[in-house]
């Protein structure tokens, strides 16, 4: 088994190779004069090849890189190609919102499936959309690794884990279960792409260390509003935790300025707040899916 990692997946790829006791080979990346991408993988591959690449922003560019890297692995002799795409672009466009629109995530899933025998992703925005892949696909959770990290970092503190909305409730529950602490969630109404309104809800947070956890932090709007609601209820120190730290539109600056002590993220996308690796559950999924 060999692990191929693009520049977007190299940190996770290195850790995954260690977990699998496999060889790691970086993917060479270059551009033609017109800006088009070209990748190169080791020639004369054989056996199982694991391709690690994240579709972090810029998503369209990284979607193309995923497609051509998987094609390169297949064309250079891989007998089995397992795609590790920890963050899947377009995952929030999983249905037709207006007449005439595509189901964008379905199109992306089909494109990535073309040169893969199996695919693994992490904390997919809507797990039910795994059905859009044309190959066996597994969605693994970062909850256990996040929970272990929080349990060690906040040992002895009066900790509570909060989901910023109903959609984050299950992740908050799983993380809190690993930590052995209480959990709850807030309720929100989305006003626009980066504007939300948090509905008042009484929570037992006064004076406590609070970790707000969600599958992804994009613009940070939800987290900022959630922090305001929790501070109004007397919460102590606030932390923001997530699987996918996209952190667009100066989100990190907004979060820290709004009172968060720190941001805790995994290595599914390149980011400066990575403290937790999803390599262990991904490695387990590779072993389960590999023929």
UniProtKB/Swiss-Prot annotation:
<dbReference type="GO" id="GO:0002189">
    <property type="term" value="C:ribose phosphate diphosphokinase complex"/>
</dbReference>
<dbReference type="GO" id="GO:0006164">
    <property type="term" value="P:purine nucleotide biosynthetic process"/>
</dbReference>
<protein>
    <recommendedName>
        <fullName>Ribose-phosphate pyrophosphokinase</fullName>
        <ecNumber>2.7.6.1</ecNumber>
    </recommendedName>
</protein>
<dbReference type="Pfam" id="PF13793">
    <property type="entry name" value="Pribosyltran_N"/>
</dbReference>
<keyword id="KW-0479">Metal-binding</keyword>
<dbReference type="GO" id="GO:0005524">
    <property type="term" value="F:ATP binding"/>
</dbReference>
<comment type="similarity">
    <text>Belongs to the ribose-phosphate pyrophosphokinase family. Class III (archaeal) subfamily.</text>
</comment>
<feature type="binding site">
    <location>
        <position position="214"/>
    </location>
    <ligand>
        <name>D-ribose 5-phosphate</name>
    </ligand>
</feature>
<feature type="binding site">
    <location>
        <position position="125"/>
    </location>
    <ligand>
        <name>Mg(2+) 1</name>
    </ligand>
</feature>
<keyword id="KW-0963">Cytoplasm</keyword>
<comment type="function">
    <text>Involved in the biosynthesis of the central metabolite phospho-alpha-D-ribosyl-1-pyrophosphate (PRPP) via the transfer of pyrophosphoryl group from ATP to 1-hydroxyl of ribose-5-phosphate (Rib-5-P).</text>
</comment>
<comment type="pathway">
    <text>Metabolic intermediate biosynthesis; 5-phospho-alpha-D-ribose 1-diphosphate biosynthesis; 5-phospho-alpha-D-ribose 1-diphosphate from D-ribose 5-phosphate (route I): step 1/1.</text>
</comment>
<feature type="binding site">
    <location>
        <begin position="34"/>
        <end position="36"/>
    </location>
    <ligand>
        <name>ATP</name>
    </ligand>
</feature>
<dbReference type="GO" id="GO:0006015">
    <property type="term" value="P:5-phosphoribose 1-diphosphate biosynthetic process"/>
</dbReference>
<feature type="binding site">
    <location>
        <position position="165"/>
    </location>
    <ligand>
        <name>Mg(2+) 2</name>
    </ligand>
</feature>
<dbReference type="InterPro" id="IPR029057">
    <property type="entry name" value="PRTase-like"/>
</dbReference>
<dbReference type="GO" id="GO:0005737">
    <property type="term" value="C:cytoplasm"/>
</dbReference>
<dbReference type="GO" id="GO:0000287">
    <property type="term" value="F:magnesium ion binding"/>
</dbReference>
<dbReference type="InterPro" id="IPR029099">
    <property type="entry name" value="Pribosyltran_N"/>
</dbReference>
<feature type="active site">
    <location>
        <position position="188"/>
    </location>
</feature>
<keyword id="KW-0460">Magnesium</keyword>
<dbReference type="InterPro" id="IPR000836">
    <property type="entry name" value="PRibTrfase_dom"/>
</dbReference>
<keyword id="KW-0545">Nucleotide biosynthesis</keyword>
<dbReference type="InterPro" id="IPR005946">
    <property type="entry name" value="Rib-P_diPkinase"/>
</dbReference>
<keyword id="KW-0067">ATP-binding</keyword>
<keyword id="KW-0808">Transferase</keyword>
<keyword id="KW-0547">Nucleotide-binding</keyword>
<dbReference type="Pfam" id="PF00156">
    <property type="entry name" value="Pribosyltran"/>
</dbReference>
<feature type="binding site">
    <location>
        <begin position="92"/>
        <end position="93"/>
    </location>
    <ligand>
        <name>ATP</name>
    </ligand>
</feature>
<keyword id="KW-0418">Kinase</keyword>
<dbReference type="GO" id="GO:0004749">
    <property type="term" value="F:ribose phosphate diphosphokinase activity"/>
</dbReference>
<dbReference type="GO" id="GO:0016301">
    <property type="term" value="F:kinase activity"/>
</dbReference>
<feature type="binding site">
    <location>
        <position position="190"/>
    </location>
    <ligand>
        <name>D-ribose 5-phosphate</name>
    </ligand>
</feature>
<dbReference type="InterPro" id="IPR037514">
    <property type="entry name" value="Rib-P_diPkinase_arc"/>
</dbReference>
């Amino acid at each position: 088994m060999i692990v191929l990692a693009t520049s977007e997946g190299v940190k996770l790829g290195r850790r995954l190779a260690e977990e699998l006791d496999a060889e790691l080979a970086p993917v060479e990346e270059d551009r033609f004069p017109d800006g088009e991408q070209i990748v190169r993988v080791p020639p004369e591959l054989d056996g199982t090849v694991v391709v690690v690449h994240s579709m972090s922003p810029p998503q369209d560019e990284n979607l193309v890189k995923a497609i051509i890297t998987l094609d390169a692995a297949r064309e250079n002799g891989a007998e089995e190609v397992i795609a590790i795409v920890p963050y899947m672009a377009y995952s929030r466009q999983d249905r037709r919102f207006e007449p005439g629109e595509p189901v964008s995530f379905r199109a992306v899933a089909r494109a990535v499936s073309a040169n893969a025998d199996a695919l693994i992703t992490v904390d997919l925005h809507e797990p039910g959309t795994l059905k859009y892949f044309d190959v066996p696909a597994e969605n693994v959770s970062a909850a256990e690794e996040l929970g272990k990290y929080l349990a060690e970092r906040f040992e002895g503190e009066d900790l509570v884990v909060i989901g910023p909305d109903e959609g984050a409730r299950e992740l908050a529950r799983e993380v809190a279960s690993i930590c052995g602490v209480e959990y709850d969630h807030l309720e929100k109404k989305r006003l626009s792409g980066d504007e939300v309104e948090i509905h008042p809800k009484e929570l037992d947070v006064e004076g406590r260390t609070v970790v707000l956890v969600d599958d992804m932090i994009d613009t940070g709007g939800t987290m900022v509003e959630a922090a305001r609601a929790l501070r109004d209820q007397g919460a102590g120190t606030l932390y923001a935790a997530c699987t996918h730290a996209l952190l667009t539109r100066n989100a990190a600056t907004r979060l820290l300025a709004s009172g968060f002590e720190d941001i805790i993220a995994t290595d599914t996308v390149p980011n400066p707040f990575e403290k937790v690796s999803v390599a262990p559950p991904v490695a387990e999924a590779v072993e389960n899916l590999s023929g």
